[in-house]
Structure formats: structure tokens, C-alpha cells
Regions:
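C-terminal motif of bacterial Sec signal peptides marking the signal peptidase cleavage site
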Residues: 3-6
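Short, aromatic-enriched amphipathic alpha-helices that serve as compact interaction elements
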Residues: 12-27
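Short, well-ordered alpha-helical segments enriched in acidic and aromatic residues
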Residues: 29-39
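Short, charge-rich amphipathic alpha-helical segments embedded
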Residues: 39-57
Length: 151
């Protein structure tokens, strides 16, 4: 059995997260984006925001406003995703004076609870129940973060 990247098995979520950690610490944005789907994360965040408002909408005008907002968000999504990608790339390439990756520097892929179901995994840093994210396995076998899940 092949072992790599600090004794993590290849083609596992943990291995992809170890590769992502290395890319972030090396300020290697291109490699980091191999393991993070910013477009999908932004789409999921927008979806969740509208779902939250829809669950609280109780008058027709509010429902109409939410529907209009959802349509506008759909039209703006490519520009928003590009802006998010550019900001993430800038953060990765920066000397990290803002402390973006302080948790990554201190962390280890072994402090993650990873529940895999087929080609999907839910990852939860141990001791941080409010922080979860979903990963999907790509065609070539590596895993990519596709959604940040908030309780």
C-alpha cells in the first residue's frame, strides 16, 4: 500500500487536505485551487443565505423580494465568484500578515473528523462543531472542498 504526504493514503480526503495545507503554507495558489472549488463554495453560500430568508418569509412582498434577489444573484454569480477567487488567490500569495492561515500553520490533518460516503465527505475539525465543510472526489481521484457548511 502506497503512503505519501506525511503518511496519508493517496486518493483520500485527508491526503488532499494535506496537499492543500502544504500549498497554503508555500503560498502556492495554483495547487491550492486544485483542492478548493471557490465557485461551488460561493454558490452554496448564496443558496444557503436565500434559503434562510425564505424560511422566515411570511408576507407576499417579502417572498417577491427574495425571489427577485435570487434572480439578481444568479446573474451576478460569475462576477462574484471571480471576485472571490481573486481575493482568495491574493490571500494565498500574500505573506499572511492578516493571519489568514494561522490555523493552517498550527493544524494537522489528523485533527479532522472525516465521514466519507462514496464520492462525498463531510469534514469537521475536532473541537469545532460550528465549522464543517463538504468535499467531493474528482475524476482523477483527488478531493476538493465544494461547500462550507454552517449550522
Amino acid at each position: 500500500m502506497a503512503l505519501a504526504s506525511g503518511c496519508t493514503l493517496s486518493n483520500t480526503p485527508r491526503r488532499s487536505l494535506a496537499e492543500l495545507r502544504t500549498a497554503l503554507l508555500n503560498h502556492d495558489a495554483d495547487t491550492a485551487f486544485r483542492y478548493v472549488d471557490v465557485d461551488s463554495i460561493v454558490r452554496c453560500m448564496v443558496r444557503d443565505i436565500f434559503a434562510k430568508y425564505e424560511s422566515k418569509a411570511d408576507d407576499p412582498l417579502m417572498i417577491l423580494g427574495i425571489k427577485a434577489g435570487r434572480e439578481a444573484a444568479g446573474l451576478l454569480m460569475p462576477a462574484v465568484a471571480e471576485l472571490a477567487r481573486n481575493r482568495v488567490r491574493a490571500a494565498i500569495l500574500s505573506p499572511d500578515e492578516g493571519g489568514y492561515f494561522e490555523y493552517v500553520q498550527k493544524g494537522s490533518v489528523w485533527y479532522l473528523d472525516i465521514a466519507t460516503d462514496g464520492k462525498t465527505a463531510v469534514v469537521n475539525p475536532i473541537g469545532k462543531p460550528e465549522t464543517k465543510f463538504r468535499m467531493r472526489q474528482m475524476e482523477d481521484g483527488h478531493w476538493k472542498i465544494v461547500e462550507i457548511m454552517r449550522e
